[in-house]
């Protein structure tokens, strides 16, 4: 019985790659991947303030934008992304403002965030942003406190 419970727990939650794979194939979906090399080039053009210093910590980015997709695709995405937790990620912030939901999730090891996930749904918006890098939780907390 314990083994069955363990297997069920592992299977619970949506795998992030399968979400990207499923929805990037939808008509009018935009999926953009920015490689570490391109991120390095982009970093040459950002300023030197505290936000820019934080942005330098991220090595790659992947964006899934479903704004131009059909209502049924957006609803299906919203249900999948909001109904269950995403494997390996913890929710840092969740905001529901006039029908628009924003969640910021993180995958971390010790006190370092390795991946940051931003999910926006509602009011016609369906966007998923994945940032990979190494950022301390305290730096993200400061940024979130400033923005909220």
Question: Could you tell me what each predicted segment is?
Answer:
Residues 1-19:
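Bacterial Sec-dependent N-terminal signal peptides
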Residues 11, 97, 121-122:
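Mature, soluble, non-transmembrane domains
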Residues 26-29, 56-58, 97-99, 113, ...:
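Extracytoplasmic
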Residues 72-85, 129-132:
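Surface-exposed flexible segments
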Residues 105-136:
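A short, solvent-exposed beta-edge/loop patch
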Residues 141-148:
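A recognition module on extended beta-rich or small alphabeta surfaces enriched in W/G with H and D/E
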